[in-house]
Amino acid sequence: MNKPFIKICGITNTKDAALATSLNVNSIGFNMYEESARYIPKEKVKEIIRELPENTIPVMVFVDPTFDYVRSCLDISPKIIPQFHGKETQEFCSSFEREYIKAVRVSKKEDLELGSQNYSNAWMILFDSYINKQFGGTGKVFNWNFFKGQNIDKDYL
């Protein structure tokens, strides 16, 4: 049996980051989307990342960002993995020359297969519930029966 990959997102302070890493999570996520209630400025992320254990992967979550904004955020550390939650193309996501996670909003069964096909070079796919005008961490569960009969050849969250 494979060990699950555990990522806690929405970290906004060093205390929460320390708690998450004490629980041996694989990754912690920082929301770089200014419209999010869990938005954190990149300067604060830089402070938190300095304190992370070597084996904890920092992930930065973006929604339809500019190339320059992503680049400036990723320049903080070569360990950072970007996670894209908007309408970014595979070409855009892969233009940063590092692994990335692509969130795919799911409202119907076909979204699962299309998401993994359209982002074939993603490190992982994050399947997220489709909620109109709400991106990432919706707190809503989509119909997991959609996975029945699917052959997804990509790691996913």
List where the protein language model places each region:
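Conserved N-terminal beta1-alpha1 strand-loop-helix module at the mouth
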Residues: M1-L157
